[in-house]
A protein has these predicted regions:
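Carbohydrate-interacting regions of secretory-pathway proteins
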Residues: 23-245
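Bacterial N-terminal signal peptides that target proteins for export
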Residues: 1-13
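C-terminal motif of bacterial Sec signal peptides marking the signal peptidase cleavage site
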Residues: 19-21
Length: 245
């Protein structure tokens, strides 16, 4: 992540998320070839409570502490693209307990992230929100540490090696948040699980740079965020959410 101061076919992607969705906290993500032309979701996904967060208008997003979508973000052919350094995007809605699924692709040396349960109390969303790290492990310096490699809960919980696909290939990710329990999945494999507020979590946060921000990770409800402040390109597709009731 290194903050500053301030294809696979659709069928393969769906099959990966079928495995990813089979968690202790959430139900499986249904797979199908019958895709809705308006939402980008399959009929089974829609029936199962999934909702797409992407459409050409980007009406479900805005800039962090802004009212509109900032320069640098665009949507075409089902793909959300960030070009160059841009302000972070946040969802207009807030979410508490949910499954968030998405496909992502980075160029060689690429670096980005997806935040969850973020607030706008600080200057940057990453001071309040845990981050699912997106990274080209092979070429970016952050890939030298599992704490900051692809799929990690950035700088707090490490991810295992050998799961992320090479640069310029699509990866499929799933984040499951239910109460204080969180899971990160990548390409059908569970990477990590942690409990917010546990003694282990408290110790890890205390040992991280986030100790400077008392409310880091503590919101029970917040925004989904897409990191834009690094140079380079980020591509996202099939971004969808299912709230856990």
């Amino acid at each position: 992540m290194m903050h500053g101061t301030a294809a696979r076919t659709a069928i393969i992607g769906q099959l990966a998320l079928v495995v990813a969705g089979c968690t202790q906290m959430g139900n499986s993500v249904p797979a199908s070839n019958s895709t809705s032309s308006t939402s980008g979701l399959t009929a089974e996904q829609t029936a199962g409570g999934w909702r797409s967060l992407l459409d050409p208008s980007l009406a479900q997003w805005r800039g962090y502490k802004q009212q509109t979508v900032p320069t640098g973000w665009s949507f075409a052919n089902g793909v959300l693209t960030k070009t160059g350094s841009a302000e972070d995007l946040v969802s207009k809605d807030q979410y508490g307990n949910f499954e968030l699924a998405f496909d992502w692709k980075l160029p060689p040396g690429g670096n980005a992230g997806v935040f969850y349960r973020g607030t706008e109390e600080y200057d940057h969303i990453y001071w309040s929100a845990p981050e699912y790290q997106l990274l080209d492990d092979a070429r970016h310096p952050d890939g030298k540490s599992r704490l900051t490699s692809a799929g990690a809960d950035y700088a707090v919980y490490p991810s295992p090696a050998g799961v992320v696909k090479p640069a310029d290939e699509w990866n499929s990710s799933l984040i499951v948040v239910n109460g204080n329990r969180v899971q990160h999945w990548l390409n059908g494999q569970k990477l990590l699980e942690y409990e917010i507020g546990s003694s282990d979590w408290e110790a890890k946060v205390k040992a991280s740079k986030f100790v400077a921000y008392p409310n880091y990770g503590r919101a029970s409800r917040g925004y989904i965020g897409l990191q834009g402040d690094h140079d380079g390109t980020l591509q996202l597709r099939n971004v969808r959410i299912r709230e856990i009731k």
